[in-house]
Each structure stands twice: as structure tokens, then as C-alpha cells.
Amino acid sequence: MLKNIYVTPLNLLKSATSLQQQVRTTFVLKRKYDPPLHKTNEKPRRMRAKNFIYELVDDTLVKKRPNIEVVLKTFVEGVGDKGDVVSMKPHFVYNKLLLPGLAAYNTPENVAKYAKTEAEKSTVKHSSPYAQRTVNMLETIVLAVVMNKDEPWVLEPWHIKASLRKTGFYCREECITLPKERIEGPDLKKENKDFYCTVTINKLEQARLKCRLHHWSTDPSERLPYVLEHWKLQSEPLLDVCSPEKTP
């Protein structure tokens, strides 16, 4: 008798064949033609085909979503420092801040929890959210320092300042620290040779800037051949010239 009993297999742990996910699409519509009126307590009149024509009022799928406020748990480059309350786009907040655990939602509890302590306030590691980004950009470029081929010169901070201005960076001469050894010319042996200088940002961050010497003449017949994309080529360090030491 027990052999005739049909045993139903359990599929409790069986994986689903398709992914069912909620779709957040809401459309606000309005009728183009109003439906016909009917008297009270009477059967509504039959609507015609034109009464089922709708006009789109609002599409929430393409509607811009408001920014989300979060509290940063640590320093985030280009965003802010620990304890700062920032308001940014939802897509960036979810993928770059909340999922990696760099921020939490803006609540009074989280603001008090992730606020800076007195010891952290006294120790300043970053002068601004964008200072480290500037350091990274300066350390990835090869700065072309164009010097005169006909007249004698001595490399000074304002030469580096002018070369940086050509590439879109603006800084003061006091922020530039040249190597200890004197660099003077013109000297074609130093053509396309590299040396390093230090750029100080907001009197805190320091960037190690790679520079490359080029000689230029106002006389077209005396000019050196043009080198295409010189920063991609390998070069030798400038003889007896070392990079300046970073101040602690």
C-alpha cells in the first residue's frame, strides 16, 4: 500500500529560472478628449475610441532625481574630508560612496558618529578635496621647459611658472623648488634631458614634477628639429642634477 503513494519532490532549494526585478517606471497621463457625462444613478455612457487617446504629462524614468546627502567616513579625493556632509548625484553616491563603505546616509546619528575628533582636527593631511588630484596630475606629466638657444640664461622658478601656465596650471614662484645644483645654458648637451622640481600646493601637499629642457631660437634657420610627442620618448637625466628633497 505504501508503494502506491506518490511522493512529490520538494523544489525549495531549486534556483529560479528567470530574474524577477521590480521596474520603477511611472507614467502620468491625461485624456486628450474628456469622456461623455452621464446623469446621477444612471449607467455611464459608452466611450468612443477617441476617449482612449492619452497625452503624456510626466515620465519618471527620465526625470532628474534629486541629490542625496551623505556623511563621509574618510577622506575621498575630489569629494571631501571625514565628517563632511556632501550632496551629490544618486548614481555616484550609490556606486562610489555607499557601496565601498566610504560614506553613510545623512542622519543626526551618523553626523555625530563620523565627526572629526580633536586629534584629527589638529592633524591636517589634506588642504582641500582637490589638492591630491592636482598632485596626481602634476606627477603624471612631462613639462617642457623651453629656454633660449642664443642668449645665456640661468634656470629660475619663473621659467617653470611660465611653462606650467602653458599647460593650464597656475602657481606662484614661491611654490616652486628647483634642484640644488645650478642649471644654466645654452648647452645643447642638456637638450631633452630631464630634471625634477617640487611644487608645493597650499603649503601642504608636494608634487614631484618632471621637467625636460628644450632650446629655442628666434632665428628659424638655427632652430632644432621638432620632436613630435617628446614626452613619450625615453631620455637621460640631466647630469649632476638631482631632484629636490621634499620638506617634511
Swiss-Prot record:
<protein>
    <recommendedName>
        <fullName>Large ribosomal subunit protein bL9m</fullName>
    </recommendedName>
</protein>
<keyword id="KW-0687">Ribonucleoprotein</keyword>
<dbReference type="InterPro" id="IPR000244">
    <property type="entry name" value="Ribosomal_bL9"/>
</dbReference>
<feature type="transit peptide" description="Mitochondrion">
    <location>
        <begin position="1"/>
        <end position="25"/>
    </location>
</feature>
<keyword id="KW-0689">Ribosomal protein</keyword>
<dbReference type="InterPro" id="IPR020070">
    <property type="entry name" value="Ribosomal_bL9_N"/>
</dbReference>
<comment type="similarity">
    <text>Belongs to the bacterial ribosomal protein bL9 family.</text>
</comment>
<dbReference type="Pfam" id="PF01281">
    <property type="entry name" value="Ribosomal_L9_N"/>
</dbReference>
<dbReference type="GO" id="GO:0003735">
    <property type="term" value="F:structural constituent of ribosome"/>
</dbReference>
<dbReference type="GO" id="GO:0032543">
    <property type="term" value="P:mitochondrial translation"/>
</dbReference>
<dbReference type="GO" id="GO:0005762">
    <property type="term" value="C:mitochondrial large ribosomal subunit"/>
</dbReference>
<keyword id="KW-0496">Mitochondrion</keyword>
<keyword id="KW-0809">Transit peptide</keyword>
<dbReference type="InterPro" id="IPR036935">
    <property type="entry name" value="Ribosomal_bL9_N_sf"/>
</dbReference>
<dbReference type="InterPro" id="IPR009027">
    <property type="entry name" value="Ribosomal_bL9/RNase_H1_N"/>
</dbReference>
<comment type="subunit">
    <text>Component of the mitochondrial ribosome large subunit (39S) which comprises a 16S rRNA and about 50 distinct proteins.</text>
</comment>
<dbReference type="GO" id="GO:0005739">
    <property type="term" value="C:mitochondrion"/>
</dbReference>
<dbReference type="GO" id="GO:0006412">
    <property type="term" value="P:translation"/>
</dbReference>
